[in-house]
């Protein structure tokens, strides 16, 4: 028996593509343990005003009713294909979906979230109007039962269309001025296919690890000021379950990002050193804060590695003549004292 199986209607990719005048968009939806939310997500996709879609539901070995629910959708809409596979995690499911996708453009959706019905239409119109190959949009948040969450805080809010070069967009993303989620943009499939793209399997924070790889291979990025995606706030999400392993995944993700950026755009080397310093200082602070809230122990070896990393980055930034932001310097001074208190007792014990 094959590790993967696929369910679909009899319609072919060529039929979905029509005469080629309207680009085919592949929507990739990893599915695992979301039977409560899956139908609402898929309904938003099949109801898109942009009709030329293939919707890939990748069942990642879900233990609930999701596999049967996915199969049932193929009888309701001929554009839906279902891939059943053994559980491998979000990145693995995305990679499988990407390998199976036949569209001219790629869009990833999380199966517990919801989308506006004009999301693809707005993205594709923007691609055409601005000769772009990557279009980003805003998002808002909904509760577990799908109700809008109102807040005066709007993350990375903007009111006008923003046109960016890849380098401009990368710098904005690294500075957290652009959201680092794969569901926050539609991109040309060639960006993925022509550069050997894949998500890192077996890790969290996979979006940060790879988003700049996509941005960097585009030729024009356009951001539109519309909230087209609805992110569902659920208990037990990654952000609500901090651990030392999650901290390690954050470190690996930002290292992956830096490696790609510096190799692809060497002129950003000094910029990345400063941004890495800012990132690690803030990550450290948040790890210690979360350890107090969640009551988990910080591994002294991890603490020592991060301390040494910050020391090295501090020297690199000073050597380049760059100025550390005042807020980061203040936090850095506090963290140095905290590290000394955490690491020195263990060193003394070994002596």
Segments from the language model and where they lie:
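Acidic helix N-cap motif at the loop->helix transition within catalytic regions
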Residues: 39, 53, 64-72, 84, ...
């Amino acid at each position: 028996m094959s590790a993967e199986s696929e369910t679909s209607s009899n319609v072919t990719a060529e039929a979905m593509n029509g005469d080629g005048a309207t680009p085919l968009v592949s929507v990739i939806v990893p599915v695992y343990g979301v039977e409560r939310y899956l139908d609402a997500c898929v309904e938003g996709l099949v109801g898109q005003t942009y009709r030329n879609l293939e919707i890939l539901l990748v069942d990642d070995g879900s233990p609930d009713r999701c596999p049967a629910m996915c199969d049932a959708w193929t009888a309701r809409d001929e554009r839906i294909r279902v891939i059943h596979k053994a559980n491998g995690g979000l990145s693995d499911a995305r990679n499988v979906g990407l390998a199976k996708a036949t569209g001219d453009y790629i869009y990833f959706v999380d199966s517990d979230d919801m989308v506006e019905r004009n999301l693809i239409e707005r993205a594709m119109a923007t691609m055409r109007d601005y000769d772009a190959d990557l279009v980003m949009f805003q998002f808002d948040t909904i509760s577990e039962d799908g109700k809008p969450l109102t807040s005066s805080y709007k993350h990375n809010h903007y009111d006008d269309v923003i046109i960016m070069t890849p380098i401009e967009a990368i710098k904005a993303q690294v500075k957290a001025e652009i959201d680092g989620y794969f569901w926050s943009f539609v991109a040309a499939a060639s960006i993925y296919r022509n550069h050997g793209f894949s998500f890192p399997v077996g890790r969290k924070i996979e979006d940060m690890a790879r988003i700049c790889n996509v941005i960097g291979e585009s030729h024009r990025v356009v951001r539109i000021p519309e909230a087209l995606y609805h992110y569902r706030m659920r208990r037990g999400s990654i952000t609500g379950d901090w651990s030392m392993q999650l901290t390690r995944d954050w470190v690996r993700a930002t290292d992956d990002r830096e490696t790609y950026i510096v190799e692809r755009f060497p002129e950003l080397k000094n910029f990345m050193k400063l941004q890495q310093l800012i990132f690690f200082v803030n990550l450290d602070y948040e790890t210690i804060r979360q350890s107090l809230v969640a009551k988990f122990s910080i591994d002294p070896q991890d603490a020592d590695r991060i301390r040494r990393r910050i020391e090295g980055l501090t020297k690199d930034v000073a050597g380049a003549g760059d100025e550390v932001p005042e807020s980061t310097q203040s936090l850095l001074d506090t963290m140095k004292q905290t590290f000394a208190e955490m690491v020195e007792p263990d060193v003394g014990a070994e002596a």
